[in-house]
Amino acid sequence: MARTLRAHGVTTVFTLPGGHILPFLDASIGEDLRIIDTRHEGAAVLAAEGWALATGQTGVAAVTAGPGFANGLIGLLDAATWSVPLVMLAGRTSRNRQGRGAVADVDQRAIAAPIAKWAASCSDAGRIPRYVAEALHRARTGCPGAVYLEVDSHAVYGNAAPLDVVPDGFPVEPSRAAGAPADIGAAVAALAAAERPLIVAGSGAFWSGAGTEIGRFAELAQIPVITASAARGVVPDSHPWSLGSLVHGGLAIPSADCVLVLGSAFNANVMYGGAPLFGTDQTIIQVDIAAERVGGNRAADITVIGDIAPVMRDCCEAWTATPPGREEWLDRGRALAGASLEFWNRQIDEHTGERIHAGAAVRTLADLIHQRFGGSATCVADGGDALAWALAYFRSELPGRLLTTTTALGTLGVGMPFALAAQAARPGEPVFLFTGDGSFGLSAMEVATAVRHQLPVIAIVSNNAGWGDVRYEQDELFGPGRHVASTLPGIRYDRLAEALGGHGERVERLEELAPALDRSIDSGVCSVIDVQTDPDVVSELLRMVAQLGLM
């Protein structure tokens, strides 16, 4: 198993050890396969997802049977929901003991199958290379996704003759299918005829590696671009035709008469393709590698099925119109995005509370990171309202440098797993995590993982002493102050970091953040900066989500 993974280009596996996978972990020693062990199987699989989001490569995690498998399911579910290429390997009770009350005996495949893109079970040591190769292939074929492979103890502990770790027929290069010429022609014609066209690039653009092609087409056709989810940075925010993120640039979408949607489903993240984000009289062009992802909540007027990079390359070649002179439309989009940013800034600047405004903390952090590292730093965001503020202020100049929890699933606790994976993928480069205190608590023990593996992640915790989203909803639904199970008072996350061998800082005034950040960077170890934020602050994004009832 270890040799097959290495032969197919896998360099790093995230895990938590257990008896059902010990031979695999032992074999990794001689195969130059880096093993990063976490403190919870959920963190291991989420870290594999973070590796994929940071690098564009397939992430791999290995967990033991039974409870280990169950703990890891959150990572499989999150990656499956977000179409992230991931392989979850799991141990399994030996086949001759299944159904007899053996240790950790669970029908794991039956549980994983409805979640995963592909789920398989291997009980023959001689077939391990083929199963592993196929798992890696399935994760990247067509629309990327999470796959599950279990190998039972009979196979893992058994003896097998030397095996070909690259079986016949593997590796198989992922399909780079272009769209039908007629569909591409129709899309280009609609965009040429439009007065106010817009490109919205979703996660599929990242997995396709289509940034160059999208940027070129945007300049050629003079169409503003918005990037969302994993596609943040695919077209840099500094690109001459970029409107930045969906938070601010998205305000231009209702004014567009034609929207080219690249690699994004019409889910809750984009208001299901409806109001207030999308209009009813717009021409919608949807490009996706998987036909089953097209339409759904919003029908597309023109559909192109194909890999986004070759589709956009063909769009560039098909574009024969003279430059349409859409600078005025670009200026209008920038004005709308700028007005949105100013609106968010006013919420911060008009704050009079004694504790720090969460938005002020992340705005200051984003400015400091940009000043000191430009676009080379990796930023991770986790939480509810903490995530909203991060989405409003974190810039993105390179793909895989802004990792967030922007799945429709809404998984919390991904922050530390994503951050340590990004740091493992980019040794020597800075990685920053901005997270709420509630979400940080779900994976806080991974500070120990980062310390143990010398991954100097810097986590900035917006500590408003509770589950801010939940408190807000409780206030709105049941009346002010009726908070049940939503307060987390008196926790010193900086001291937790110190107890785990890391560096800790506590920030009570905004001006203390910059020197605390400097000391954390200089410490050279995983650091936690506990920022005391105002529990009464609520972002407009959270208010809007609650009002629209997107859940």
Region spans (language model):
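Active-site diphosphate/adenylate-binding microenvironment
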Residues: M1-A2, R6-H8, L16-I29, A335-P417, ...
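N-terminal alpha/beta PP-like core and its mobile active-site loop of ThDP/TPP-dependent enzymes
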Residues: M1-E328, F343, L368, P456-A459, ...
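Short acidic loop-to-helix transition motifs that present clustered carboxylates
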Residues: H20, E41-L46, F69, A386-A388, ...
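Thiamine diphosphate
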Residues: L89, R97-A104, I253-A256, G295-N297, ...
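Phosphate/pyrophosphate-binding active-site segments
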Residues: G126, E150-V151, L163, D281, ...
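Generic recognition of flexible, low-complexity loop/linker segments
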Residues: L136, G185-V188, E213-I214, H248-G249, ...
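Basic phosphate/pyrophosphate-binding loop/patch that engages nucleotide-derived ligands
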Residues: T141, F373-G374, V451-P456
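Conserved short loop/turn motifs at secondary-structure junctions
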Residues: G202-W207, E350-G353, G436-G438
